[in-house]
Amino acid sequence: CLISPTVQNGNVLSFFCFVEENNCPEGFKCCPLTNVTHPPNKAHKGCCAKYRGTVEKPKQ
C-alpha cells in the first residue's frame, strides 16, 4: 500500500483503516494513520482514504 506523496490534510472525504489487507479499493488512496483523525492503534497497518479532487468527475 503506497502512500501518496500528494496527500494533504483537510481533503479527506471518507476513510477506513485496515489490519490485514493493504490494498485500497478504487477511488481510495493509501494514507498514513497520522494523516487521519484517528486514535493511534498498533493493530492497524494503515488507512485508505478518499480525497477531495481524486474522484473522477463526469465529463460534460
UniProtKB/Swiss-Prot annotation:
User: Where is this chain primarily localised?
Assistant: secreted
Q: In which tissues is it expressed?
A: Expressed by the venom gland.
Q: Which domain of life is it from?
A: Eukaryota
Per UniProt, subcellular location reads as: Secreted
What post-translational changes are documented for it?
Contains 3 disulfide bonds.
Which key words tag this protein in UniProt?
Disulfide bond, Secreted, Signal, Toxin
GO MF annotation terms: toxin activity
One GO cellular component from the entry? extracellular region
Q: Which family does it belong to?
A: Belongs to the scutigerotoxin-02 family.
Name of the protein in question: U-scutigerotoxin(02)-Tl4a
Q: Which organism is it from?
A: Thereuopoda longicornis (Long-legged centipede)
